[in-house]
Amino acid sequence: MANLGCWMLVLFVATWSDLGLCKKRPKPGGWNTGGSRYPGQGSPGGNRYPPQGGGGWGQPHGGGWGQPHGGGWGQPHGGGWGQPHGGGWGQGGGTHSQWNKPSKPKTNMKHMAGAAAAGAVVGGLGGYMLGSAMSRPIIHFGSDYEDRYYRENMHRYPNQVYYRPMDQYSNQNNFVHDCVNITIKQHTVTTTTKGENFTETDVKMMERVVEQMCITQYERESQAYYQRGSSMVLFSSPPVILLISFLIFLIVG
């Protein structure tokens, strides 16, 4: 924590020094330069007092001769011929309208990031989430027959588990127990609907497989949970808050 505080202090000093140098940089202009120290004086040979509004002589608002608001001949507000307010042919909108094309829907990146970080919430399962796909573990069941049966049928068993956020459970055992039950139930119902049935041997092996996968899922969730907690503790400490606040004050000021 002390090393982290030192690095934060070094970063703060470096940023503050850079801001100080930026403020001391001379502004462009001066004698014998391309810029002008006096805004009212143009380049040599040019008009020192151009008319206000950016137009030519006799142009009150930046348009051509007889153009009151910057449009072409007979254009009162800067549009093309027959365009009252600057749009295209038959358009009454601004210059950025393009033949009434519908705007494309924008993707909400916050929602996408939240779904990727927390897993996909499964509708109709009361807040359960579906974990990412896993490789089915190598398990020995104590007999050559069961081991061979598992190798031949492991593709029929789930490779993803259903779970709830770990902060809803008091310990790992409760998390794993609930995870195993809901995963086997959902997989059995889905598979039975397709016309495939499971034997007692299948159920026994699925329980072992899903249990190992639920333990792995708990370890992943636990690691992510503590990482989020550590980040919150770091940025909520008084020294870090003070440094960040002072840095923001220097940038804004």
Swiss-Prot record:
Pfam families: Prion, Prion_bPrPp, Prion_octapep. Residues 23-230 are annotated as: Interaction with GRB2, ERI3 and SYN1. GO terms for cellular component: cell surface; cytosol; dendrite; endoplasmic reticulum; Golgi apparatus; inclusion body; membrane raft; nuclear membrane. Cu(2+) 1 binds at H61, G62, G63. Residues 1-22 form the signal peptide. GO terms for molecular function: amyloid-beta binding; aspartic-type endopeptidase inhibitor activity; copper ion binding; cupric ion binding; cuprous ion binding; glycosaminoglycan binding; identical protein binding; microtubule binding. A lipid is attached at S230 (GPI-anchor amidated serine). Gene3D superfamilies: Prion/Doppel protein, beta-ribbon domain (1.10.790.10). Residues 52-95 have a biased composition (Gly residues). Residues 51-91 are annotated as: 5 X 8 AA tandem repeats of P-H-G-G-G-W-G-Q. Keywords: Amyloid, Cell membrane, Copper, Disulfide bond, Glycoprotein, Golgi apparatus, GPI-anchor, Lipoprotein, Membrane, Metal-binding, Prion, Repeat, Signal, Zinc. Glycans are attached at N181, N197. Transmembrane segments: none annotated. Residues 23-38 are annotated as: Interaction with ADGRG6. Cu(2+) 2 binds at H69, G70, G71. Its main location: membrane. It is a lipid-anchor; GPI-anchor. It is found in: Cell membrane; Golgi apparatus. Residues 26-108 are annotated as: Disordered. Cu(2+) 4 binds at H85, G86, G87. SMART domains: PRP. It is linked to PrP is found in high quantity in the brain of humans and animals infected with the degenerative neurological diseases kuru, Creutzfeldt-Jakob disease (CJD), Gerstmann-Straussler syndrome (GSS), scrapie, bovine spongiform encephalopathy (BSE), transmissible mink encephalopathy (TME), etc. Monomer and homodimer. Has a tendency to aggregate into amyloid fibrils containing a cross-beta spine, formed by a steric zipper of superposed beta-strands. Soluble oligomers may represent an intermediate stage on the path to fibril formation. Copper binding may promote oligomerization. Interacts with GRB2, APP, ERI3/PRNPIP and SYN1. Mislocalized cytosolically exposed PrP interacts with MGRN1; this interaction alters MGRN1 subcellular location and causes lysosomal enlargement. Interacts with APP. Interacts with KIAA1191. Interacts with ADGRG6. Its primary physiological function is unclear. May play a role in neuronal development and synaptic plasticity. May be required for neuronal myelin sheath maintenance. May promote myelin homeostasis through acting as an agonist for ADGRG6 receptor. May play a role in iron uptake and iron homeostasis. Soluble oligomers are toxic to cultured neuroblastoma cells and induce apoptosis (in vitro). Association with GPC1 (via its heparan sulfate chains) targets PRNP to lipid rafts. Also provides Cu(2+) or Zn(2+) for the ascorbate-mediated GPC1 deaminase degradation of its heparan sulfate side chains. This is Major prion protein.
